[in-house]
UniProtKB/Swiss-Prot annotation:
EC numbers on record: 3.5.1.44
Organism in which the protein naturally occurs: Syntrophomonas wolfei subsp. wolfei (strain DSM 2245B / Goettingen)
Domain of life: Bacteria
Disulfide bonds: none
Alphabetical UniProt keywords: Chemotaxis, Hydrolase
CDD domains (UniProt xref): CheD
Keyword Nucleus: no
GO BP annotations listed: chemotaxis
Name by which UniProt lists this protein: Probable chemoreceptor glutamine deamidase CheD
GO molecular function: protein-glutamine glutaminase activity
Family: Belongs to the CheD family.
Keyword Iron applies: no
Catalytic activities: L-glutaminyl-[protein] + H2O = L-glutamyl-[protein] + NH4(+)
Length: 161
């Protein structure tokens, strides 16, 4: 019997097939799904911010793109994954609110998306697909069995990436 494992904001969880991982309420946040298809191990990290370098308190590694990805790689390797086999899919990074002036500092979703992609490249993890941007939230369900990432939205349908 498979179960669905809930991943909260600034949280990280792993699952092996047939279990699935879900996170709801991705606005400017990004869900980073990594998986090793050989052992059917997957992880989901729900990051909120692009970098831990400016944070006063960076103790929660899952909160940031840079440390969240390192956490996921480290924990997956402890559970038998090989970093060289890891593949990624991401979703989120929306611009949920319109701000006057539109300074880059307020474009958290876009900054998160860029930071996640840069960190994936840094760790030589191939990004297979992404569903980022826009101005709407997402709920995602990741299946380590198939590598499918189901993206559900309100008003923008559902799709598997």
């Amino acid at each position: 019997m498979s179960k669905i494992i809930q991943v909260g904001m600034a949280d990280f969880k792993m699952a092996t097939a047939p279990d699935k991982l879900i996170t709801a309420g991705l606005g400017s946040c990004i869900g980073i799904c990594l998986y090793d298809k050989v052992i059917k191990l997957g992880s989901l990290t729900h990051i909120m911010l692009p970098s831990s370098s400016q944070a006063k308190n960076a103790s929660n590694e899952a909160k940031f793109a840079d440390t969240g990805l390192k956490l996921a790689i480290r924990e997956m390797e402890k559970n038998g994954a090989q970093a060289s086999r890891l593949l990624a899919k991401i979703a989120g990074g929306a611009q949920m609110f319109k701000f006057s002036g539109e300074s880059d500092i307020m474009k958290i979703g876009e900054r998160n998306s860029v930071a996640v992609k840069e960190n994936l490249q840094l760790h030589r993890i191939k990004l297979l697909s992404s569903d980022t941007g826009g101005n709407y939230g997402r709920t995602i369900i990741f299946d380590p069995e198939t590598g499918d990432l189901l993206v559900k939205t309100i008003g923008h349908g559902e799709r598997i990436i």
